Amino acid sequence: MEDKCLIVILGATGDLTKKKLIPAIHNLVANKKIKDFAVVGVGRAHSNPKLILKKSKKYVEKLNKKTWSTLEKRMYYFQADFYDNIGFCKLEEFTKSIEKKHKLPGNRIFYLATLPSHFKAIADNLSRCGLTKEKIRRKQGFKKNWTKVVFEKPFGHDLKSAKKINKCIKKVFKEKQIYRIDHYLGKE
């Protein structure tokens, strides 16, 4: 990934973030796949970036101290309830301030490391508060930007619920923005 971007992890205090996402971001930075970035963890629990990173550290296989130091300087935490529209509007202001601080161009990846029951509320609040709107960010001075959203498996508990979730998120995002993944598919 050559583009500068902000990575927003919703569900930042959970196991997926601790065991998989933070170690993966560490590896991307260590392997020079991303250079100019920042990470905003979002969760309902009271936390902070230092605590999230501390809990993740033991899951990084080949810890690079310089990379870890970079991650410590570029990781932030924002407490918000996934069902609170006002909290998400404050998150928009927070993300803009982080993008400005790190001179990021408005490219955003939203990673929903949450239960599928939260997907609709999160997608609606991201959209309602302008967090995913590329056109709005262009008006704010970000020339050319993109938004991606990652939905982590399980994607519903059966076919009916998966279709319902898919219908909801397609009201908010274009198909080219959506990534549905299963991190276990890569395991041997």
Residue spans for each PLM region:
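Secretory/organelle targeting and membrane-embedding segments
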Residues: M1-F151, F155-E188
